[in-house]
Amino acid sequence: MQSRLSVRDFSMVIALVLICGFFAVMAPPFLSARNLSMLMTELSITGTLAMGMLMIILTGHIDLSVGSGVGLLGGLASVLVFKQDLPAPAALAAASLVGVLLWLLMGTLIVRERIPAFIITLGGLLIFKGLFWLVIQNSTVPVTRGGVANLYSSLTTFYVPPMAGLVLAALLVAILVWASLRSRAQLQAHGFPVEDGESSFLKLFIAAQAVFLLVIVANQFRGVPLPALILAMVTFVVHTLTKHTSFGRYLYAVGGNEEAAVVSGVPVQKVVIAAFGLMGGIVAVTGFMQTAYAGASTTTVGELMELDAIAACVIGGVSLKGGRGSVLGVLFGTLIMACLLNGMTLMAVPPEFKFITRGLVLTLAVWMDVRLSKA
């Protein structure tokens, strides 16, 4: 098992290096400070959504409605701000509450009525898309009123000052090291096998270098964009939940073997419903960032984001069968997808070939998951 995980981990690193190297040669602006700052914003939005998707997939379920939910909740907040003149914080809070309630409802239907998540969330995809268009009345709704900046619009226009960015980078690396050492100690204390020290150190070293490199490059433009901080906070919360709480252990148990989890006393229904409730909150946050990044709610906001989130998870080593996956893997998967899409945009690749490439990458990731699972 350990060797298979190492193959997957290092294959992701190699793939990322090759992708970045290719676009650095074919599209020189790819490594510019301005583009990397934009890339950081884009991957932060997708990565935030993928963190929620990780928890859903860990339970052995799937959520196809998140893309439409991103549009709906972002659009609802825009309408409350622009048309109802509601203060931005109140509008964001109201839309977040709606998101949590909608996803709690879907989670309840899945576990109480025993309806497959695929069907429930597919229905949600269509319903939320229709509601989204009704809410914005098939028009463009700005995130500001009278062009005056507010909390909503600042989600993607605020940048952390350079020195503060470096301090936050150091803090993030310290948290990564602490979390890794704590997790390793807990596994050893319970007699579970742990990764060899060299591999663990190499991963942390690469992660630390990547964090500082991104911050240094971002500081050459305007600084670290706010979405990157939001992703960091969401990532920390999800990592803590999945690795250091009973809820996280239940997520893995339900996805690994639901029948065994029931016998062991795991409250399966509550765990799944809670995972969907958290997903609703994360969809809302993603919707606000995506809409603010676009500058307004339009009928295309959120399109296919569910596929990008699923692809980031699968590329990052999350098993679609449930019970296996990690936050770090999802971050790598998100980074690979974001670099791929950003690079193709810089090369002016036609949309049809972008779709084909995304489909091929997702298919290849699933194929590798199946092959490594059988090895």
Regions found by a protein language model. Name each.
Residues 19-84, 108-118, 133, 260, ...:
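Single transmembrane alpha-helix segments in multi-pass membrane proteins
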Residues 42, 117, 143-146, 161-170, ...:
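Loop-to-transmembrane alpha-helix initiation sites
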Residues 85-126, 332, 337:
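Alpha-helical transmembrane segments within multi-pass membrane transporters and channels
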Residues 1-21, 25, 140, 172-205, ...:
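Cytosolic-side transmembrane-helix boundaries in multi-pass membrane proteins
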Residues 103, 276-287, 293-359:
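Transmembrane alpha-helical segments in multi-pass inner-membrane proteins
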Residues 125-242, 298-299:
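Transmembrane helix-bundle core of multi-pass membrane transporters
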Residues 180-196, 236-276:
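Membrane-helix/interface signature in polytopic inner-membrane proteins
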Residues 28-38, 133, 137, 215-228, ...:
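Inter-helical junctions in multi-pass inner-membrane proteins, predominant
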